[in-house]
Amino acid sequence: MELTSLEARVIGCLLEKELTTPDQYPLSLNSLALACNQKSSREPVLSLSESQVKTVLDDLTKKRLLSEQSGFGSRVVKYKHRFCNTEFSELQLSSAEVAIICVLLLRGPQTPGELKTRTNRLHEFADVSQVETALLALSQREKPLVVQLAREANKRDCRFLECFSGNVDDYDVNSSDAIVVSNHTQQTLQQDSKIVELEQRVKLLEQKLAQLESLLN
């Protein structure tokens, strides 16, 4: 799955608002434009017009990463993502992974410490090792969803880049050093992976049950 930088911004905004303001989700074009142009929690800060955002929405719809929805008696079209964790998306992520991908889409490369701080409204990580666990799982998928960048000069921690829109060729990738994680992270990774797998199975069963109930009704 490849995204342009603007598509990444839109998907990131939809993921964020779905979690932080669920009563206002899906989003109208106006709300989505405001979210894309937010001055906080966005790097870089943009100034997109509604027509520019609509063009991006049309492109995402063609990629089947977006769906439109209109309320009963309302002419306002609203938009919701099909990026992950829906019956239409192949990509299934844990809540921790969604939070990390969301921040990386909205803010670019981040260190584990930065991610722990900046995901606080999306998912509660007890410590940095839990962030590292999720990053390790994302990086070790058959098609990696994040990549660790080489440590910058005079910096203690490496940053991570999402692989959907991040142009890896523009960065120095950490090809020599293994991803540094704590002992706790290494010990719990397998357990967390099993939990994620079970959560995904439960979600699929719930979706199938809902489909059966709709047929019976």
From Swiss-Prot:
Pfam family of the protein (one): DUF480
Which PANTHER family does the UniProt entry name for this protein?
Answer: UPF0502 PROTEIN YCEH
UniProt cross-references to HAMAP family, sorted A to Z: UPF0502 (MF_01584)
The name this protein goes by in its record:
UPF0502 protein Sfri_1696
The organism's lineage is: Bacteria, Pseudomonadati, Pseudomonadota, Gammaproteobacteria, Alteromonadales
Which source organism does the UniProt entry give?
Answer: Shewanella frigidimarina (strain NCIMB 400)
Top-level taxon of the source organism:
Bacteria
Report the family membership: Belongs to the UPF0502 family.
